[in-house]
């Protein structure tokens, strides 16, 4: 790829500019202005790419890489795609995160020759730049999730970053200030397709993490692109304001992000930007903080491979509209933290849950509506078709019907919160009538085909279509008129490619033509040919009718679109209302279908889930005709930490995840998979469940685990929910136990937040003796001879052994390996020589892992009490050895 910092002289030298053809010089001039793009250069019926662009595109598109002559001594690599198949190929390029410049011909070859002679080069220029963050076409973007372009600015103090993000396809724009430590987490929430960054951040850790952890496309701009004075002027000009305070109370960093996004849109869309509302200022703390690892671990909107199957979203998404799907996606990505707003959403869900008949009707009607948000954007950017206007018309019609459903049932007694949602569903009959009167039901997608405007809307349109559809009848009518005038019954009107339409009369009847309006054109052996002004006019009308009607229809269509754009604010409110109806009806439908319950919220540290289930796992089991084993979770101010032990495959990780997911579902306004749920609002959720070596970043499993754990301890607050699974397992046993122990102490004593902590280190269960807010729980199992049965129930108590060999057998290890493992285990149980270490004690509330001071005056009592608690048959080899060391240390 061409180096972006190459100057013009270097560029021309590299590509032999001075000896290139005029056409290739034109290409190179345009390419130099778009070095960061793949340039698609229109050549007749093809878009062609040259040099490095051709090499890249041929691989991505799977098309042949050929050559187009030589430039000096160098052959020019080239590939091309048919212009009519452009969209299909663009989809592939966009998927690979390429930035594409479309260079079109601005005149025909004939027009070029008329201006500059037969060697003239057709005028060309870039008409549009397509980037992952600026796409609006439905073929290129997912219909059920947003497509954000973001701009990120980090001020000098680096304490707070500013972030602006816009979805061009729906004309939504937001701005937020984000603590520096939360930048990656906020980007993970938004999942922008493209991020604008200053060049001075190119080599920063932030840019490296955005690329490696999130894999988002970064578009770098020169530092001056984000200059505050320049950006402020851009904002004022765009919104036609005199004072930046018209935006609201925004920081200088936010001014830079908004201005840079508007400038980038202007550059890529060639000034053709849709009307964007004033940016909505977002309070970062109004949403639950969920970090990158937690989003991945919980599989909230995507699964661990980046797909949708098996995610929480795929399980609870039964929306029936595209905009409803996007709103649900946004809800799940951004759970609320304001208890008032959460309860408002839950009340709406409860209303629909209590009215299943209304839900059923509304969902059927919602299936008829279109994605008018994106329709409207295409209209404002002059990339629409008649189908977009028809979609708006049908949606307006259906919205009126939907509003009627509510009043049929409730009359004027609707709750205020429902009245507020459905208010925009009516009130624009004028717009409906306009589209109904103008746009044909069979309007084609392509404006150049004509046939968009109803004939009765404009007399000239009717006249031209009459000519197109009934041209033969008009010719026959004129022929009959001339036969009557001349008395020549054999008179014909014919056509050839030389003289066009003409009147044909046999030679013997030529003397009957006396009227001077008949103009002689040609004489042959057997006939004489004439024309008239009337016939020439008819011919001209027939020849030009198609062109004229298309031109007229385009003008009328543009005028109709302008009238629609005037109503854009109303249409956006309508789209929001319909999407909210879809989401809340979806919540009600899912709650009824899957037996979910309305959660109750408090301002304390309650987390009381009765018979909770994992929504995704439950549905997967149901498909196999199996039942999910529900479990309770009862965290509170006085029992904040559950330490959960038990073998692998018993269900610990599922239990951890399901409770985090229940909190998220509850705080988006959804009912939850449980018999009852009482939750103190969670401000942040952190999970560390499993880890893999991050080879790209050169990090081991243990380093990745420690980094995640460190971030959790640094960012959690008293109102957070922490989910930890097997902390410390990536290192030696004693190091691992020590780390897990101290992490638990820190959470208990310093953070004082709710935590579910799963571990294989049974030594940690003794901490319940001196950490009053920590309680032990385990997974119930049933031993059947040498086999075990996982019951998946969470019960009070601690696991007495790991059952690792049983799990290994279930995993399919060879029988010889299992038998040998059992022999070794038996030997360890009899004569263990594994070194132990005493880290178990219960002697005081001031216990510290590294400060064991036994009280010698109570040794006898302690030994007696200790021996009474020992069951030799239930001790693992490791536990037995550690017990010996403990007893030795006590005496």
UniProtKB/Swiss-Prot annotation:
Function, as annotated: This protein is involved in the repair of mismatches in DNA. It is possible that it carries out the mismatch recognition step. This protein has a weak ATPase activity.
Keyword match Nucleotide-binding: yes
UniProt entry tagged with the keyword Endoplasmic reticulum: no
Annotated CDD domains: ABC_MutS1
Keywords: ATP-binding, DNA damage, DNA repair, DNA-binding, Nucleotide-binding
GO molecular function: ATP binding; ATP-dependent DNA damage sensor activity; damaged DNA binding; mismatched DNA binding
Biological processes annotated in GO: mismatch repair
Protein family according to the UniProt entry: Belongs to the DNA mismatch repair MutS family.
Protein name, per record: DNA mismatch repair protein MutS
Origin species: Rickettsia canadensis (strain McKiel)
Binding site for ATP: 646-653
Gene for this chain: mutS
PROSITE patterns, A to Z: DNA_MISMATCH_REPAIR_2
Pfam families according to UniProt: MutS_I, MutS_II, MutS_III, MutS_IV, MutS_V
Domain of life: Bacteria
Lineage of source species: Bacteria, Pseudomonadati, Pseudomonadota, Alphaproteobacteria, Rickettsiales
Membrane spanning residue stretches: none
């Amino acid at each position: 790829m061409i180096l972006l910092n190459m100057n013009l002289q270097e560029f021309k030298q590299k590509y032999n500019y001075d000896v290139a053809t005029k056409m290739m010089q034109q290409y190179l001039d345009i390419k130099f202005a778009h070095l960061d793009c793949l340039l698609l250069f229109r050549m007749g019926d093809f878009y062609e790419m040259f040099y490095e662009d051709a090499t890249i595109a041929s691989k991505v598109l799977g098309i042949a890489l050929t050559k187009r002559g030589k430039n000096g001594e160098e052959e020019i690599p080239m590939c091309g795609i048919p212009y009519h198949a452009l969209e299909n190929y663009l989809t592939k390029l966009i998927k690979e995160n390429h930035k594409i410049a479309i260079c079109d011909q601005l005149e025909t070859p004939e027009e070029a020759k008329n201006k500059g002679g037969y060697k003239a080069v057709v005028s060309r220029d870039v008409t549009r730049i397509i980037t992952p963050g600026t796409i609006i076409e439905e073929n290129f973007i997912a219909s059920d999730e947003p497509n954000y372009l973001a701009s990120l600015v980090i001020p000098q103090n680096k304490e707070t970053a500013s972030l602006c993000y816009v979805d061009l396809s729906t004309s939504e724009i937001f701005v937020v200030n984000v603590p520096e430590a939360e930048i990656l987490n906020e980007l993970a929430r938004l999942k922008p397709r493209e991020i604008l960054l200053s060049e001075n951040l190119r080599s920063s850790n932030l840019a490296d993490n955005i690329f490696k952890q999130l894999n988002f496309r970064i578009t770098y701009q020169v530092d001056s692109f984000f200059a505050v004075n320049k950006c402020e002027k851009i904002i004022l000009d765009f919104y036609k304001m005199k004072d930046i305070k018209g935006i609201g109370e925004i920081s200088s960093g936010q001014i830079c992000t908004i201005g840079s996004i508007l400038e980038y849109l202007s550059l890529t869309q060639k000034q053709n930007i849709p009307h964007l509302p004033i940016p909505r200022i977002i309070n970062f703390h109004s949403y639950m903080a969920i970090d990158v690892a937690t989003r991945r671990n919980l599989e909230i909107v995507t699964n661990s491979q980046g797909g949708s199957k098996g995610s929480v979203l795929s399980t609870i998404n039964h929306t029936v509209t595209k905009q409803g799907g996007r709103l649900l996606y946004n809800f799940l990505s951004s759970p609320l933290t304001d208890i008032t707003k959460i309860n408002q959403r839950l009340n709406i869900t409860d209303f629909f849950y209590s009215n299943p008949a209304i839900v059923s009707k509304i969902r059927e009607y919602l299936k008829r509506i279109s994605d008018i948000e994106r329709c409207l954007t295409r209209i404002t950017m002059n990339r629409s078709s008649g189908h977009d206007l028809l979609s708006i018309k049908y949606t307006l019609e259906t919205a009126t019907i939907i509003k009627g459903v509510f009043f049929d049932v409730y009359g004027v007694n609707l709750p205020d919160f429902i009245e507020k949602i459905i208010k925009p569903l009516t009130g624009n009959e004028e717009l409906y009538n306009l589209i109904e009167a103008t746009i044909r039901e069979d309007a084609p997608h392509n404006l150049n085909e004509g046939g968009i405007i109803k004939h009765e809307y404009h007399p000239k349109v009717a006249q031209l279509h009459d000519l197109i559809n009934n041209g033969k009848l008009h010719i026959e009518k004129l022929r009959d008129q001339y036969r009557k005038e001349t008395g020549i019954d054999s008179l014909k009107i014919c056509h050839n490619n030389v003289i066009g339409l003409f009147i044909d009369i046999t030679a013997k009847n030529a003397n009957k033509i006396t009227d001077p309006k008949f103009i002689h054109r040609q004489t042959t052996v057997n006939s004489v040919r004439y024309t008239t002004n009337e016939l020439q006019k008819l011919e001209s009308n027939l020849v030009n009718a198609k062109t004229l009607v298309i031109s007229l229809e385009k003008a009328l269509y543009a005028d109709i679109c302008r009238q629609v754009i005037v109503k854009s604010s109303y249409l956006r409110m309508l789209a929001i209302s319909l999407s909210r109806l879809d989401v809340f009806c979806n919540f009600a439908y899912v709650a009824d279908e899957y037996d979910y319950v309305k959660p109750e919220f408090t301002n304390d540290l309650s987390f009381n889930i009765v018979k909770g289930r994992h929504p995704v796992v439950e549905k997967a089991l149901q498909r196999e005709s199996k039942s999910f084993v529900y479990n309770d979770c009862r965290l509170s101010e006085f029992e904040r930490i559950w330490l959960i032990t038990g073998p692998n495959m018993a269900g610990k990780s599922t239990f951890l995840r399901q409770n985090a997911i229940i909190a998220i579902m509850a705080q988006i306004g959804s009912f939850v998979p449980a018999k009852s749920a009482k939750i103190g609002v969670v401000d942040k959720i952190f999970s560390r469940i499993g880890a893999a070596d991050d080879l790209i970043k050169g990090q081991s499993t243990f380093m990745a685990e420690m980094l995640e754990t460190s971030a959790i301890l640094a960012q959690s607050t008293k109102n957070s929910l922490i989910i930890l699974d097997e902390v410390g397992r990536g290192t030696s046993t004693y190091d691992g136990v020590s780390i897990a122990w101290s992490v638990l102490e820190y959470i208990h004593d310093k953070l004082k937040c709710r935590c579910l902590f799963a571990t294989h280190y049974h030594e940690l269960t003794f901490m319940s003796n001196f950490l009053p807010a920590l309680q032990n729980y385990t997974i119930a199992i049933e031993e059947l001879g040498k086999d075990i049965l996982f019951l998946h129930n969470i019960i009070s108590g601690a696991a007495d052994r790991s059952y690792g060999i049983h799990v290994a057998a279930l995993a399919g290890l060879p029988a010889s390996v299992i038998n040998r493992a059992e022999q070794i285990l038996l030997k360890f149980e009899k004569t263990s020589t594994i070194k132990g270490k005493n880290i178990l004690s219960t002697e005081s509330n001031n216990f510290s892992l590294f400060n064991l001071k036994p009280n010698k005056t109570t040794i006898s009592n302690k030994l007696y009490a200790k021996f009474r608690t020992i069951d030799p048959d239930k001790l693992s080899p490791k536990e037995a050895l550690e017990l010996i060391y403990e007893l030795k240390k006590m005496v």
